[in-house]
């Protein structure tokens, strides 16, 4: 590519065409910036602006109040002993795996684990054993199955897994497994539990100590109204000196933590998380209403012939639907499998991936009952239009 003036016109400022649409994309609903975060995005957008008053350790910066945020506010919010900021939930998971386990050790993953959990384990050169889930339509994770997976690992390898992980909720069906029971089962074998909370921390109340988990990974850009990439990593020391292991320092660069490569998310990403934090804390207190909205929405779509997969009654805003009637329509209309995406787009609704009709997932988080009613009416109109 020749970087002449004509070629460079492809870049520069690019407007986002979906920014004013009603958003039901599970990846995006929890990451929409608050107004304070939008102001912070501009104020702290310069690359290393966070380092105006840095003494060499990101999480110890006092102006702005990064130290207070990371070492006081976030531990209280997450129910953990120590917190660090990372570049995302996947980086948090990898840091734990890489620090806790040795090459060739086994990590136990739930059968609904996100691909990034698998890749993180592979990057750490670990063996993976998955806990099976029940079949359609529930996709249930049995806590006792973690014990079975651990015992099978001990039988085959001669030692317990280095770590177990639970996705809470899973990113396909929005199921919330019994994390407290699973933690208890794992601890019977002295196996620590990592909770992947990419879709929960910042949306709903999550207290790691109450659940009995050792590590918690959260996503700022997915669920804490932050610009990405940014995540959180929380560590509890009730079952071991895990903070010393995870946050060990370099012997040569004595104030730099090895697993974090020194400093992680900074400037715009961190400052948008801090700016949104007051509203994020408050919105988790409204979780009961969010669940009520999700259940109401699911019930309405099911009256039209769609089928919600996963837990019922549902306990999360992320939902997966099977839509045989929409799929049937897609087999005979001119727009084919893109008809649903185009119909929703024409009604200012964004979030269901283009080309999906038979199965799709969506999120009702902070969409509001009025907009959800409009979306329900839109589905009704679309189905009747093609009957």
Curated annotation (Swiss-Prot):
Q: Which domain of life is it from?
A: Archaea
Q: Which residues carry this modification: N6-(pyridoxal phosphate)lysine?
A: 222
Asked if the record carries the keyword Transferase, the reply is yes
Q: Name one GO biological process term.
A: translation
Which Gene Ontology terms cover its molecular function?
A: Sep-tRNA:Cys-tRNA synthase activity
Reaction catalysed by this enzyme: O-phospho-L-seryl-tRNA(Cys) + hydrogen sulfide + H(+) = L-cysteinyl-tRNA(Cys) + phosphate
Keyword terms, alphabetized: Protein biosynthesis, Pyridoxal phosphate, Transferase
The record's function comment reads: Converts O-phospho-L-seryl-tRNA(Cys) (Sep-tRNA(Cys)) to L-cysteinyl-tRNA(Cys) (Cys-tRNA(Cys)).
Record family assignment: Belongs to the SepCysS family.
HAMAP family named in the record = Sep_Cys_tRNA_synth (MF_01675)
Protein name, entry field: O-phospho-L-seryl-tRNA:Cys-tRNA synthase 2
What species is given as this protein's source?
Methanococcoides burtonii (strain DSM 6242 / NBRC 107633 / OCM 468 / ACE-M)
